[in-house]
Structures are given as C-alpha cells and as structure tokens.
Swiss-Prot record:
Pathway: Amino-acid degradation; L-arginine degradation via ADI pathway; carbamoyl phosphate from L-arginine: step 1/2. GO terms for cellular component: cytoplasm. GO terms for biological process: arginine catabolic process to ornithine; arginine deiminase pathway. The gene is arcA. Pfam families: ADI (PF02274). This is Arginine deiminase. One of its GO terms (molecular function) is arginine deiminase activity. It catalyses: L-arginine + H2O = L-citrulline + NH4(+).
Length: 411
C-alpha cells in the first residue's frame, strides 16, 4: 500500500510529521470563576506559554520533524465559501447552550473576518461584549454573569486528544467533557477538505458522531499489530470495542490485537498516556500507582476470532506479562516516574513526568522540571531532550499530550 499523509504504526518510529496547536488568546479568556468548566486548574501566562511552545516546535524541527499547525490547516480547509458556511453552522450548532439565540449576530461578526481570523476567533471564544445585542429573549433579562456567547477552547494545544492517528487512518473523537466536545470539528474539516488530506481516502476508524467517548491520550499504537487503549474517565469500553471492530473489519488494517487497560477514573490519571508511555522497543515509562500489586489490574485483550467471525476477549491481570506476550518481547522494562518514590513520583506525575513524546527509538522529549524521572531515563540508556514548560504544564499535559503524530517511519 502506498503511504498517504497519515501513517503511524508505532509509538517509537522516527517521527516525521506532527500536528501542533500554538497556544492563543483562548488562554487569556480563562478566568478563575470558570476554570473548572473549562478543565483548567490555573491560568497560564500566554506570552511565556507561547515561547515554551515555540521552543518545543523548534526542538522537533531540529530533530527532522515537519511541524504542522492545527489553526493554519483549519483555515486552509475552509477556502470554499460553502465549506466555510457549513463550518460556522457546525460550530454554532454545538454552542447553543451559550449562544442564547444570537446565531445571526455572531454570524455577522464572523462575516467580517478572514478565514484565519475566523478560526482563531472560534478557538479563542466570543465574549458577550463583542456582540452586545439588544435584549430580545427573556433569559437575557436574568442576572446572568456568564461572559461568553462562544466558549474559549483553552485545551486545544493538547492536540493528542481530539484525534488519533492509527495506521493509515484516524479516529475523530467524541470528547468526554462538553468543554472539549467542539475541538474535533477542526480535524473533521481538515481531513475532508484540506488539499493535503481530502483525496487520500483516509480511513476514519471512528467519527465524532460516535455515541461513545474516546480521547487520543488513551490511544497508544504499540506496534503495527497491537494497540493499547486506556479505559478511563474519558474513554469508554464501548468506544474501544467499536474501534476494535472497525479496524478488524478493514482489510487494509494490520492490527490484530487491542489491549484495553483500565486506569483509575480521576483527573490525576486523566488518560493512559499520563501514566504510561512507550519510549523504546522494550521500555515504558510508568506511574507506579497504576500497577497496584501486579496481578491486580483489569486488562483485556481483544482479538478477531476467525472461526466464530466475531471478536474474542481475554482477561489478564499482569501488565508486564501481557505486554511481553502481545509484543513478543522477552523482558519489558518499566521505568517508574520519580523513581517510584511516594513523593517524587506523585509530584512528577502531576507535572506529566510519564507523558513523554518519543521521536525515535530511545529518544524522548520531556519537561525539564521532572529531573528525577529524566535522570532515571538517562541511566536506563534513553536520550532525553528537555524543554521548559512551567506555563504549558498548568493545563495538565506534557509533550505527548501537546503533539499528534501524523507520520512515523516504520520500525
């Protein structure tokens, strides 16, 4: 099969093309009263966050990675006036709770904007003061202090979650929280309308109309035959089974097994990749807290049964044994966040010490603040490229969260 614009058959193959989103004014629309609803714990300082993100992007370029930006691709995808109109309608249709019937006024604002300005405005949010219409609905006479007609999307710089590259295809995800639900609209339009992608016949394993929640931070491509997916607060067992069935049904897909790993449902353990990432052929970072006592985990191996013409599900309780079996590796090494220390491990996991981005086998990008974990990685033979992230980390995501690989070399 000829390679298209998407090819990701592992977590560790040399990264050639990546999708990023530079933090924008959406971060300046974060205010203390509404942090919880927008899934933030703190307010990053935009100027510094942008400098940190620009350095992250430059590090990737210096390692031979082509960096694409979500906001630029999205603007290039709506050049056709009809597509632009449909895009606006789709965004507004998912914002009815805050728009309060002012679609036409918002469309009038959008009509004054270029394609890039439109995308940036939708991402950053529309404040009520930008529209300031006369009160025409009873709800507007109520004592409503909420400042937005269109909510900002401050989580967009975590490009890992709204979509996930799997093989030559992609999942366009239904996000768990309403605050992030609109984020996958952008990749939907990019895949369907951008010149780089639209004629490539990219398999859509799951689309955003799927009734079940799934997020890219839970989707790991361990090899061309094995996926690992976290059953988490944000990714449902139903979505994992649906994804497995769709992949097994596709003759172009090479994947034979889907390993579903249950993790605690809490913000601390937001996605599988916040506690577990693959960094070399036989090495994984891991947060010790998810291991419990080995032999006490809920792990499920989903395969296609050729005899019964349906999926089969086997249960396991040992993560190390399961990975060694499905990957055909004799001795998997787990490298614990913060060296497994009860204090260092918890602190560095909170600051995404497990959330490494592998750019080729044995070479990772990490936050410099997680020095205990980084030193241990080096002791285990891993090359660690450190970036600063004092502002970026306030969104509770690391280098893997901030990147969506579109193309990796096979291993």
């Amino acid at each position: 099969m000829t390679d298209g614009p998407i090819k990701v058959n592992s977590e560790i193959g040399a990264l050639k093309t990546v999708l990023l989103k530079r933090p924008g004014k959406e971060l300046e629309n974060l205010v203390p009263d509404y942090l919880d609803g927008l899934l933030f714990d703190d307010i990053p300082y935009l100027e510094v966050a942008q400098k940190e993100h620009d350095h992250f992007a430059q590090v990737l370029r210096e390692e031979g990675v082509e960096v694409l930006y979500l906001e630029k691709l999205a603007a290039e995808s709506i050049e056709n006036p009809q597509v632009r109109s449909e895009f606006i309608d789709d965004v507004l249709a998912e914002s009815k709770k805050t728009i309060l019937g002012h679609e036409e006024e918002i469309k009038a604002l959008f009509a004054t904007l270029s394609n890039q300005e439109l995308v940036d405005k939708i991402m950053s949010g529309v404040r009520k003061e930008e529209i300031n219409p006369k009160c025409t609905h009873l709800v507007e006479y109520m004592d409503d202090k909420y400042p937005f007609y269109l909510d900002p999307m401050p989580n967009l710089y975590f490009t890992r979650d709204p979509q996930a590259s799997i093989g030559h295809g992609i999942t366009i995800n239904r996000m768990f929280w309403r605050a992030r639900r609109r984020e996958s609209i952008f990749i939907q339009y990019i895949v369907k309308h951008h010149p780089r992608f639209k004629d490539a016949n990219i398999p859509i394993w799951l689309d955003r109309d799927c009734p079940f929640n799934i997020e890219g931070g839970d989707e790991l491509v361990l090899s061309k035959e094995v996926l690992a997916i976290g059953v988490s607060e944000r990714t449902s067992a139903q979505a994992i089974e649906k994804l497995a069935r769709r992949i097994f049904e596709n003759p172009q897909a090479t994947f034979k097994k889907v390993v579903a790993i249950e993790i605690p449902t809490s913000r601390t353990f937001m996605h599988l990749d916040t506690v577990f990432t693959m960094i070399d052929y036989d090495k994984f970072t891991i947060h010790s807290a998810i291991l419990k006592a080995e032999g006490n985990m809920n792990i499920f191996i989903i395969e296609y049964d050729d005899v019964n013409k349906d999926i089969s599900i086997k249960q396991s309780s040992h993560l190390k044994d399961t990975l060694e079996d499905v990957l055909g590796i004799d001795d998997i090494q787990f490298i614990p966040t913060g060296n497994g220390d009860v204090i260092d491990g918890a602190r560095e996991q909170w600051n995404d010490g497990s959330n490494t981005l592998c750019i080729r086998p044995g070479v990772v990008v990490t936050y410099d603040r997680n020095y205990v974990s980084n030193d241990l990685l080096r002791q285990k033979g891993i090359k660690v490229i450190e970036i600063s992230g004092s502002e970026l980390v306030r969104g509770r995501g690391g280098p893997r969260c901030m990147s969506q690989p579109l193309f990796r070399e096979d291993i």
